[in-house]
Amino acid sequence: IYVQQSTNPLPLLIADLKKEVINQILKQEEIEEIKSMLYAPGYITHADLPAIYNGAKAFLYTSLRESFGIPLLESMSCGTPVITSNTSAIPEIAGDGAILVDPLDVNAIASQLLKLETNELYRKQQITYGLERTKLFSWQHTAEQLLKVYQSITKK
């Protein structure tokens, strides 16, 4: 849907899946025409992730089940807008720092990708929201919150 609606569709990097698996999925879903837009490097090391996040126009993370979602925070902290699921623990972690969508609604996902692609002001706002959100998960903030808990316990 996104590829059909976009005048200049963004390429898609798919991490941790082999190209053969992706090709099989494309064939099964009868969408092989988008194969040239996909890049599947396989496993990506942690050392390479910041460069990939920084080079991305958006980070799409539509997991159906997630207990925390560290990649969301990694991407946001690199200044990459995030489109993610409105399910499981993701909304609690993402807060207003990411665009929440139904992970099964391809129209909603495509719509948000198009909006990020075509509306630079919206994209910059999402970057700002994401950077602000990550401050809540910094080591500094976590240590301050833990100190407050300890102080409240010792005062009792």
Model-assigned labels for residue ranges:
Residues 99-106, 115-120:
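Conserved acidic donor-binding segment of nucleotide-sugar-dependent glycosyltransferases
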Residues 64:
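Aromatic "clamp/platform" in nucleotide-sugar-dependent glycosyltransferases that forms part
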Residues 44, 51-56, 61, 109:
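Short alpha-helical donor nucleotide-sugar binding micro-motif in glycosyltransferases
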Residues 108, 122-136, 145-148, 152:
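A short, well-ordered alpha-helix in the C-terminal region of glycosyltransferases
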Residues 72, 77, 81-84:
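Short hydrophobic beta-strand element within catalytic cores of glycosyltransferases
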Residues 72, 87-100:
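Short acidic/histidine- and often glycine-rich active-site loop of Leloir-type glycosyltransferases
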Residues 1-9, 28-32:
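Short hydrophobic signal-anchor/transmembrane segments that target glycosyltransferases
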Residues 14-16, 24-50:
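Nucleotide-activated donor-binding/catalytic signature segment of Leloir-type glycosyltransferases, i.e.
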